């Protein structure tokens, strides 16, 4: 069993050095510590150390480095080491060593729920009195990395979908893997009113983010999408309130995309959101709708039916189609905003790439909303504007 190696296409990744391609760093074995440093190492010095094969235990012939929006990954033999960027944006705070340490520990603990054998722990990046860096060496800790096994990318749901080899039985196993988390995970302590307020804030906050200056989005179109989602929320407050009243909102994964699901035996699911518990608090229907929406984006709309058939067959929960479509629309709306966040970072690739990605998500959100309208669902009911509970 190995840990995920996200490629540039699936994880918005690129080489740290080239900014475009996977970077491979062959090198001879030597000391596992750096040459003497007479000052506190800066980020570039840390990265240079982590790109060296001799920095890692065991025999590592080369290190492949990948940069994502919030971290660097160092692929060393059968292992992966993740260094979080000193990054702060809205709910995410990795700005200080203490914050990165806390989030590394959380990442390991939370992801062991669905990938218990693949999150090996955390590793300290240390520097000794002579200025030499090492992994778990003597001296002072200057940063922390997540240590993981490397999963074969060919096993990812994303790659299997692209190859056209995914079956309903495999999707059923993914649902079965998630069910203990949905059934036994900590419940949100939200009243009905708080849950409805959470959904409303998610919609309005996303709309505000999409309309930020510099993102180039048409405000009237964003506001129309937000209004349609709010109309559904108002018209179906009783349906959504019942989900909270039945205590279905659980601390789940929060980022259930095809590239985070591996069709191993049993399935392995990685990379949950660790930095904000509220973003992990989801209705299971919301989680599965997110995965279904991302599979739709890859051209595999059949996965939606497989996911919810497996879910209904294994639970006493039978969510109506309108609820599923609402969550697909809302998740696409949120993902459009996240795509546009990349425009704030010049190192994440061409601007047109992220504008196109956001446009695709917004088109999907409109499509799901149009589907709801065709079913006659999101008509505003003034009486339902009063949050229940």
What kind of feature is each model-predicted range?
Residues 337-381:
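ATP/Mg2+ or Mg2+-diphosphate-binding catalytic cores
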């Amino acid at each position: 069993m190995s840990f995920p190696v996200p490629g540039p296409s699936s994880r918005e990744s690129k080489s740290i050095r080239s900014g475009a391609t996977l970077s491979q760093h062959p090198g001879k074995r030597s000391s596992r510590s750096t040459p003497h440093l007479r000052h506190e190492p800066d980020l570039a010095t840390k990265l240079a150390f982590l790109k060296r094969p001799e920095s890692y235990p065991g025999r590592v012939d080369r290190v492949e480095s990948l940069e994502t929006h919030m971290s660097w990954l160092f692929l060393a033999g059968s292992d992966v080491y993740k260094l979080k960027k000193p990054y702060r944006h809205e709910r995410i705070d990795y700005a200080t060593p203490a914050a990165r340490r806390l989030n590394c520990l959380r990442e390991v603990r939370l992801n062991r729920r669905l990938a218990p054998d693949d999150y090996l722990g955390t590793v300290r990046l240390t520097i000794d009195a002579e200025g030499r860096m090492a992994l778990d060496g003597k001296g002072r800790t200057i940063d922390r990395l997540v240590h993981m096994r490397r999963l074969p990318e060919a096993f990812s749901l994303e790659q299997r979908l692209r190859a056209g080899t995914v079956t309903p039985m495999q999707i059923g196993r993914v649902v079965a893997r998630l069910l203990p988390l949905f059934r036994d995970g900590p419940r949100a302590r939200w009243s009905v009113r708080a849950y409805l307020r959470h959904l409303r804030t998610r919609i309005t906050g996303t709309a505000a983010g999409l309309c930020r200056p510099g993102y180039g989005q048409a405000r009237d179109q964003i506001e129309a999408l937000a209004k349609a989602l709010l109309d559904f929320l108002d018209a179906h407050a009783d349906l959504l309130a019942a989900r909270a009243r039945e205590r279905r909102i659980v601390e789940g994964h929060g980022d259930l995309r095809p590239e985070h699901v591996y069709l191993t035996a049993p399935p392995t699911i990685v990379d949950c959101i660790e930095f904000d518990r509220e973003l992990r608090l989801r209705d299971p229907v919301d989680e599965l709708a997110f995965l279904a929406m991302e599979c739709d984006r890859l051209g595999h709309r059949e996965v939606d039916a497989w996911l919810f058939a497996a879910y209904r067959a294994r639970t006493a929960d039978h969510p109506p189609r309108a609820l599923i479509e609402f969550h697909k629309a809302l998740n696409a709306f949120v993902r459009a905003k996240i795509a546009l966040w990349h425009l704030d970072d010049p190192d994440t690739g061409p601007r047109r790439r992220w504008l196109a990605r956001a446009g695709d998500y917004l088109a999907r959100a409109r499509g799901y909303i149009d589907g709801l309208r065709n079913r006659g669902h999101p008509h505003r009911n003034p009486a339902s504007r009063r949050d229940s509970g």
